[in-house]
Amino acid sequence: MENIKIIPSELNGEINIPPSKSLAHRAIISAGLSEGVSNIENIIFSEDIKATIRGMKSLGIEIEDITNEYKKGSERSTLKVIGKEKLTLENDTIDCSESGSTLRFLIPIALRAEKEVTFTGRGKLVSRPLDVYYNIFENQGIKYKTSNNELPLTVDGKINPGEFHVKGNVSSQFITGLMYTLPFLDGDSKIIITTELESKGYVDLTIDTLKKFGVEIENNNYKEFIIKGNQKSTSRDYRVQGDFSQGAFFIVAGILGSNVKTLDLDIDSLQGDKAIIDIVKKMGANIKVGRDYIETKKSKTHGITIDASECPDLVPILAVLGAVSHGTTKIINAERLRIKECDRLKAMATELSKIGADIKELEDGLIIKGKYKLKGGVVDSWNDHRIAMAMAIASIKCTEPVIIQNSMAVNKSYPDFWKDFEKVGGIIDEWSMGK
């Protein structure tokens, strides 16, 4: 089902939102760095999570799917993770597939094994920037080898405690990688943020997850993070929360047509993408927020200016909502989307234009003049999960079918997306396009 044809229809029903990919990465790593056994509940085996599991296994961590003995009949998996304090390199190559989190989290962690290791990947990940780490390698005398700053990357050396200067306007994944490494070194460290920190929510998730596993990091107003050395992570059982960045697609689906209730979204979550609630409220959406669910109904929405610096993953679906909202929607501070799985600003401008939206790229965002209806047509996912899902939701407001090429890009984060889309009334057919 690489290419699919969607017949426009309004969606109605309940969706059990998949677990947070951001929290699943962090929980698996925290458990792996904790001496003893942890059971991590509510896991789906998306391509990115499989990459992190492979990576941790390469570092000598035992991980086993125990769903049948732990929670028989559950749609979601439970992992038994046998962690250890001292990492041992069991495989000298770590394949990160297309997962930026896996790559950037595990590079500094792997240096604790003090053995040469090579990181590989594919797709856009091969060329996504790693300059923050290259600077650290050079400052600390860690050997590394790469061709034109692209994967594969081979590193060999030992990371030492100290001061680490990191720009705040590049990916927070580098900060997370350091936070998963520095507490376990023989000495205290400090991460100093040299520009305004964006995506604070992801850093909050890291600090909170580490704390739940017994590791403390002092946050000095997001300007510096003070980290005591020689800490120990403690094994525990942990349930991964539902994912607001995935829930956002069905939250908007309810706004565009009929009534959708998204389940397993914790209103007290630290996830930055919880911002979807306030953003759609400001746009005039009919939304009801419960303790662990969000319900949206068909609404007349209006354009606003959206600062995406703290919630970049919401931009594709917010662009869809803007395209069918009254007036003008402007998305700003989203320049980092140009170095995601694809250039998401260009992708959304290109693909929404194909189905009749009035949308233009800005250097750091998008400007969208809303229309009541879109027309349908052939679009491409750019092999990006969020583009594929956004275009599926856009079909609700189309007058003709939408054909999405490379639709299985959703496997990166949400393998059951098409099943869930049909569950609430989406009508899809496989579409060969000559294949």
Swiss-Prot record:
Q: Where in the cell is it found?
A: Cytoplasm
Q: Which residues form the active site?
A: D313
- Gene Ontology BP annotations: amino acid biosynthetic process; aromatic amino acid family biosynthetic process; chorismate biosynthetic process
GO cellular component terms attached to this protein's record? cytoplasm
Q: What is the lineage of its organism?
A: Bacteria, Bacillati, Bacillota, Clostridia, Eubacteriales
EC number(s) from the headed UniProt entry: 2.5.1.19
Sorted UniProt keywords: Amino-acid biosynthesis, Aromatic amino acid biosynthesis, Cytoplasm, Transferase
**Reactions the enzyme catalyzes:** 3-phosphoshikimate + phosphoenolpyruvate = 5-O-(1-carboxyvinyl)-3-phosphoshikimate + phosphate
> What CDD domains is this protein classified in?
EPSP_synthase
The cross-references to NCBIfam families, in alphabetical order and at most eight, read: aroA (TIGR01356)
Q: According to its UniProt record, what is one Pfam family this protein matches?
A: EPSP_synthase
Subunit structure, interactors included: Monomer.
Tell me the pathway: Metabolic intermediate biosynthesis; chorismate biosynthesis; chorismate from D-erythrose 4-phosphate and phosphoenolpyruvate: step 6/7
Residues annotated as binding 3-phosphoshikimate: K21, S22, R26, S171, S172, Q173, S199, D313, K340
Task: Give the UniProt family note.
Answer: Belongs to the EPSP synthase family.
**Which protein, by its recorded name, is this?**
3-phosphoshikimate 1-carboxyvinyltransferase
Q: List the molecular function annotations (GO) for this entry.
A: 3-phosphoshikimate 1-carboxyvinyltransferase activity
Summary of the function given for this chain in its UniProt record = Catalyzes the transfer of the enolpyruvyl moiety of phosphoenolpyruvate (PEP) to the 5-hydroxyl of shikimate-3-phosphate (S3P) to produce enolpyruvyl shikimate-3-phosphate and inorganic phosphate.
Q: Which organism is it from?
A: Clostridium novyi (strain NT)
Under the heading InterPro entries, the entry gives: Enolpyruvate_Tfrase_dom (IPR001986), Enolpyruvate_Tfrase_sf (IPR036968), EPSP_synthase (IPR006264), EPSP_synthase_CS (IPR023193), RNA3'P_cycl/enolpyr_Trfase_a/b (IPR013792)
Write down the PANTHER family for this protein, in alphabetical order: AROM/DEHYDROQUINATE SYNTHASE, PENTAFUNCTIONAL AROM POLYPEPTIDE
Q: Where does phosphoenolpyruvate bind?
A: K21, G100, R128, Q173, R344, R386, K412
